[in-house]
Structure formats: structure tokens, C-alpha cells
């Protein structure tokens, strides 16, 4: 088995930036599981399905699903979904579908297959608790709601999306509520995770902290 690093945390806590840069510095593969959930949610929505659809219908839609995550782009059955999953609506769809056991079961299996025997940095909301419970290092990133709203607002503005600060705050509060209170794989730190509050930390400071932990684990 390769060296696996799990990075969990709520939306806009810094997971994606830190995970991507950490993987680059270490020469590891990188998997953004949130992107796979958003892509599958959009895929199911395009097929006319919703979280309230019959489980059998969703099961059939997912049965022969093939997901590839290559250089930060996510493909479903060979079709690039990367641009489609960037909107706030895709994030809401993902949170709603992620509550379903049938969706999580299929995606956890696929995510584990992607990670198998790799040196890899994996980011998400249930990596250390469900997807990779035996990861060599588990990190849980957190930050104040105010800091996360500012980060997400800048991200949307950079993409040219017109959203207000109030809309972003409502989105994050709603996603936090759904992620932490869902019955299946709720968002929470693994018991052996290192919790890092990134509110007042720069990306470089967070990376330095995690790299130090990686070196310690690799040398034990």
C-alpha cells in the first residue's frame, strides 16, 4: 500500500488548495472526492433524478458508472464534467445526493479503487472516517464561518459568478448543516486526525505544518 494522506473539513476550509499543493510538493497523486460527488450529482440531475427518486432508479443509473479523475478534471463515462460542477447549484446538489446511502456506497468503492496502492493525497468530508480509515496521516481542516465565506466569495468572483456575500453565507450554513447531520458518513474529524484551524493561517503555513507531520509519519 502506498502512503495515503486524508484531508477532511467543511466547505471553504482550504482543503482543495492545500491538498493540491501538498500533492505537488510530495510528488503524490491527488483526488478531490468532492468533485466526484458534484459530478455524479449533476449526472443524476441530468438524467431527471433527484434525491427523492426511488433508490432502484438511482442504483440503476450508477450501476455501470465509470469515474476518472485526471489532472484535476473529473470525467463520467468519458465525458468531462469539470466545468459543470463549478456552480453553487452543483454544490447544493452534491450535498443533497450525498445523504443517500446508495450514492455514497458506489462512490466510496470507486474512490478506494482510485487510491489503491498509490502515494496519494485525498480530500473530502469522510476520507479519514470512511474512505481511508487506515490512512497514514489524517488531517481535519477547519476555519471560522466568516473566513470561509470570504474565501468562497472570492472563488466564485474569480470564476465570474455573480453571487452576494449573504448568498454564500446561506449556502455554507446549509451545507454545514446537511454534511454534519446526515445519517450516512456525517462530517466529523476522525478520532486520530490532526485538527488545524486555518482561519488566520496562510496556505504556506498550513502546508509547512502538514509537511512536518508527513515527514514524522514517514520516518516512523
UniProtKB/Swiss-Prot annotation:
What keywords would UniProt list here? ATP-binding, Cytoplasm, Kinase, Nucleotide-binding, Transferase
Per the record's keyword annotation, is Membrane included, yes or no? no
Q: Where does ATP bind?
A: 9-17
- What is its EC class? transferase
Protein name, as recorded: Cytidylate kinase
Q: Which GO terms describe its molecular function?
A: ATP binding; CMP kinase activity; dCMP kinase activity
Q: Which Pfam families match?
A: Cytidylate_kin
Query: What is its subcellular localisation?
Result: Cytoplasm
InterPro entries recorded? Cytidylate_kin (IPR003136), Cytidylate_kinase_dom (IPR011994), P-loop_NTPase (IPR027417)
Q: Name one GO biological process term.
A: pyrimidine nucleotide metabolic process
E.C. number(s) listed in UniProt: 2.7.4.25
Q: Does the keyword Iron apply?
A: no
Q: Which family does it belong to?
A: Belongs to the cytidylate kinase family. Type 1 subfamily.
Lineage runs: Bacteria, Thermotogati, Thermotogota, Thermotogae, Thermotogales
Reactions listed under catalytic activity: CMP + ATP = CDP + ADP; dCMP + ATP = dCDP + ADP
Q: What is its main location?
A: cytoplasm
Q: Name one GO cellular component term.
A: cytosol
Amino acid at each position: 500500500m502506498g502512503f495515503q494522506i486524508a484531508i477532511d473539513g467543511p466547505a471553504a476550509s482550504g482543503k482543495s488548495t492545500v491538498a493540491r499543493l501538498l500533492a505537488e510538493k510530495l510528488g503524490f497523486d491527488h483526488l478531490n472526492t468532492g468533485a466526484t460527488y458534484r459530478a455524479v450529482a449533476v449526472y443524476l440531475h441530468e438524467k431527471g433524478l433527484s434525491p427523492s427518486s426511488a433508490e432502484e432508479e438511482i442504483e440503476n443509473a450508477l450501476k455501470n458508472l465509470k469515474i476518472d479523475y485526471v489532472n484535476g478534471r473529473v470525467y463520467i463515462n468519458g465525458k468531462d464534467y469539470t466545468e459543470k460542477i463549478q456552480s453553487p447549484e452543483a454544490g447544493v446538489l452534491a450535498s443533497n445526493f450525498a445523504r443517500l446511502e446508495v450514492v455514497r456506497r458506489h462512490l466510496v468503492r470507486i474512490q478506494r479503487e482510485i487510491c489503491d496502492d498509490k502515494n496519494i493525497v485525498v480530500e473530502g468530508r469522510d476520507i479519514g472516517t470512511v474512505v481511508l480509515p487506515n490512512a497514514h496521516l489524517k488531517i481535519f481542516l477547519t476555519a471560522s464561518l466568516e473566513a470561509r465565506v470570504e474565501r468562497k466569495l472570492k472563488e466564485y468572483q474569480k470564476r465570474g459568478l455573480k453571487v452576494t456575500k449573504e448568498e454564500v453565507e446561506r449556502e455554507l450554513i446549509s451545507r454545514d448543516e446537511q454534511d454534519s447531520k446526515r445519517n450516512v458518513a456525517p462530517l466529523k474529524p476522525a478520532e486520530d486526525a490532526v485538527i488545524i484551524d486555518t482561519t488566520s493561517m496562510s496556505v504556506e503555513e498550513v502546508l509547512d505544518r502538514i509537511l512536518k507531520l508527513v515527514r514524522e509519519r514517514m520516518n516512523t
